[in-house]
Amino acid sequence: MNGIAWMIVFCEIAFWVVIVLGLAVRYVFKRHTLGLLFLALTPVIDLILLAATGVDLYRGASATAAHGIAAVYIGISIAYGKQMIQWADEKFQYYVTKKGTKPLKRFGMDHAKHGAKGWLRHVLAYLIGAGLLAGMIYFINDSSRTEALSGILKLWTVIIGIDFLITASYFIWPKKEKASANLRS
């Protein structure tokens, strides 16, 4: 693995470490401001990855799949970051501190609408990541050095199309609530 691939691994681990630390400090130690400070570090992690990728390419490295995945990671992190923190917050409150409401399980049209919002968020992530990929391709201006970036962009375009089809299927075949054990007599 090259340095950018390791940087992606580091950033993903750092992302979840600062979230868990932020939630633990916030709810277990009752230090809300310090907890918020940890949670606010998540965009800094994205900036570190963006800077590392930019510096590597600026120094003349040929773009690899890792450089493309870095752009995807940043797009997803920006588009989904707040939602991922809210998800972790709900789970942490309910399962760790034993407070708050049980995380909601969605069914039927509620599940379909939630899936559609997720797909729109995926489109936002795609636009951010594709913009970064297109920017790298433009600034490098050497197709032999950017083949991997173009490949990542094409693959992500196919993936977003598949995600759309899956999301549309939720409206056609809504997710049904499973019958509970108490109702099966």
Curated annotation (Swiss-Prot):
It is found in: Cell membrane. The keyword Transmembrane helix applies. The chain crosses the membrane at residues 4-24, 35-55, 60-80, 123-143, 152-172. Its main location: membrane. It comes from the Bacteria. It is a multi-pass membrane protein. Coiled coil: none annotated. Keywords: Cell membrane, Membrane, Transmembrane, Transmembrane helix. GO terms for cellular component: plasma membrane. The keyword Lyase does not apply. This is Uncharacterized membrane protein YmcC.
